[in-house]
């Protein structure tokens, strides 16, 4: 760690001692350099009236390339509102930039400001469009609007997703009233633009017990007015979190789930929605009597039950179990809460000590050159055919706790110069990785083998075959992957302003090119195979407001359309070749009927 003192300014007289740099070392020095992060602080603010430090208006986190003289590789810029005591710490913008200051991603936040007057549990809010300044007032500064932008190094960004929030005010307590979302860049900071869906929420409470903000009605509607979801809830409002019933509206009915509780607030019964025969599956839960918080028995409507007991209360782990088929198994735990062994029904019946056992060596050995013997763990699988020779897996970790090598028992069959095949018991050692200055795998080597006599010794050797080499961009996305045969796959990232989408273009070693358009919700809008023998092959995908796939159009213009009900269950598929296939469901979600186009013709 390195610290520095910021330059005194009018906003922050006297400056501030801050962390200037952080260098981390994984302890293994032949697999990549150390990682160094530097920090820069701007626009510090001390409130003279409150005599309190409000924070820095801008914090820049710089990732330094320790393989290139600690030059700046990328930087994350965070902006904060430090205008006054009430808004301190609110993040107004974040961005990721390359060394030249070119943005790749950005998030913008906007907030509302209200003075808050409380008369007991009765709140009154007064909107403020200027800075909040008061010696006596309380304030409410909720997040109103968030926008995510994709730049990919260009000067202007494309809005890939937006969210807008509205809150209950006078007579309420600042609960979220509605939420709008758009991945088309059309919503706007005032929330009056087009949106994909909007969620409206209603609440209940119990003022006599100071319980508020229990959501009882949630409605999700699309920008076109379509009703997607409607869920209601009931509570025992004598308690803060006792939801007793959830009802989901379906197109032709509703799905009801009920809950019951004990005096400790534990769920003791859950009853699922009815199936097509009106039967409701239920589960009953019984808790151990010592702490009254760990489930020791589960019964269901079919008469099945499972049990667990002999709890290690230090860690809340059950050491004895019985499953639905009346089979028993046991778990061993050490003094640090780690599982050391598991025995199943066969092991308990035959007296075998374990089916799987775990050993831990958490202490690494250090020398002048770093870690000489990494920490490791051993997983042993009991082999009934070789009782004295377990199947072992050894996992080594570096100083970050990152798995850097795995050894497994194995058999290699070899033949040379016409000799017959020969089986050799070996340890199969995972290929070594070489990391870049930012902890990413830059080189991945093939696995190797070694004798069985050094299972717990870290194998430092690298395979002689050329490794797989990966190059990344500043967002840690692979831009080039070169295999040992020197074949290379490249990936380029751009943005499409028209569809507000990220375009990922992959070119393989044979120069085949495919572009994929992805919207701000992570859904694929379009794929284009650009190197087909007959020209481009394009497949497009369309979604409804809550990102359910409703339409697929192939390169010939053939359309496959899907329809859903309010339970997100697909009720109809219209395929250009097979026609219309329709489905009906019971309230529990079981398929009741399926009708294909051929069956429909037959009546």
Residue ranges of model-derived segments:
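Extracellular hydrolytic enzyme modules, especially secreted metalloproteases
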Residues: 5-12, 316
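Beta-strand elements of repeat-based all-beta scaffolds
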Residues: 1-3, 18-27, 36-41, 47-603
């Amino acid at each position: 760690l390195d610290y520095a003192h910021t330059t005194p300014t009018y906003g922050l007289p006297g400056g501030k001692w801050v962390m200037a740099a952080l260098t981390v070392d994984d302890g293994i020095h032949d697999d990549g350099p150390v990682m160094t992060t530097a920090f820069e602080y701007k626009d510090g603010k001390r409130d003279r009236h409150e005599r309190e430090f409000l924070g820095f208006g801008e914090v820049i986190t710089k990732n330094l390339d320790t393989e290139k003289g600690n030059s700046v590789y990328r930087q994350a810029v965070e902006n904060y509102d430090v205008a006054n005591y009430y808004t301190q710490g609110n993040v107004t913008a974040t961005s990721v930039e390359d060394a030249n200051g070119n943005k790749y991603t950005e998030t913008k936040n906007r907030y509302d400001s209200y003075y808050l007057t409380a008369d007991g549990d009765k709140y009154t809010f007064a909107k403020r469009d200027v800075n909040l300044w008061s010696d006596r007032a309380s304030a409410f500064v909720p997040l109103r609007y968030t926008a995510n932008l994709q730049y990919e190094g260009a000067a202007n960004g494309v809005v890939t997703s937006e969210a807008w929030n509205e809150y209950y005010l006078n007579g309420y307590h600042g609960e979220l009233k509605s939420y709008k979302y758009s991945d088309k860049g059309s919503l706007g900071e005032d929330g009056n633009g087009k949106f994909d869906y909007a969620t409206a929420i209603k609440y209940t409470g119990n003022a006599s017990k100071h319980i508020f903000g229990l959501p009882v009605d949630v409605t999700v509607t699309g920008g076109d007015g379509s009703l997607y979801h409607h869920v209601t809830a009931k509570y025992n409002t004598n308690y803060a979190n006792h939801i007793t019933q959830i009802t989901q509206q379906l197109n032709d009915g509703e799905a009801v789930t009920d809950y019951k509780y004990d005096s400790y607030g534990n769920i003791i019964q859950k009853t699922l929605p009815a199936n097509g025969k009106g039967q409701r599956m239920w589960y009953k839960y019984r808790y151990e009597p010592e702490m009254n918080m760990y489930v020791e028995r589960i019964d269901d409507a079919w008469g099945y039950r499972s049990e667990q007991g002999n709890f290690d209360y230090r860690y809340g782990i059950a050491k004895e179990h019985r499953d639905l088929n009346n089979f028993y198994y046991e778990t061993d735990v050490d003094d640090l809460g780690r599982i050391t062994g598991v025995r199943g029904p066969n092991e308990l019946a035959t007296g075998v000590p374990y089916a799987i056992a775990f050993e831990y060596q958490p202490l690494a050995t250090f020398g002048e050159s770093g870690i000489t013997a990494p920490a490791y763990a051993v997983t042993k699988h009991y082999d009934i055919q070789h009782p004295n020779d377990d199947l072992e897996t050894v996992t080594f970790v570096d100083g970050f706790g990152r798995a850097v090598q795995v050894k497994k028992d194995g058999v290699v069959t070899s033949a040379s110069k016409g000799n017959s095949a020969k089986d050799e018991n070996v340890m199969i050692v995972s290929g070594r990785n070489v990391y870049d200055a930012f902890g990413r795998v830059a080189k991945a080597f093939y696995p190797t083998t070694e004798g069985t006599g050094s299972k717990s010794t870290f194998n430092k050797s690298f395979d002689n075959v050329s490794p797989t080499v990966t190059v990344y961009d500043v967002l840690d996305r692979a831009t080039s992957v070169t295999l040992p045969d020197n074949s290379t796959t490249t990936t380029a990232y751009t943005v499409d302003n028209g569809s507000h989408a990220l375009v990922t273009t992959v070119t393989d070693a044979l120069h085949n090119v495919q572009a994929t358009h992805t919207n701000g919700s992570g859904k694929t809008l379009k794929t284009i195979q650009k190197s087909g023998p007959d020209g481009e092959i394009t497949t497009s995908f369309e979604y409804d407001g809550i990102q359910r796939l409703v339409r697929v159009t192939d390169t010939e213009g053939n359309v496959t359309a899907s329809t859903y009900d309010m339970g997100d269950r697909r009720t109809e598929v219209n395929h250009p070749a097979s026609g219309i296939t329709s489905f009906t469901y019971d309230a529990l979600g079981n398929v009741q009927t399926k009708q294909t186009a051929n069956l429909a013709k037959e009546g």
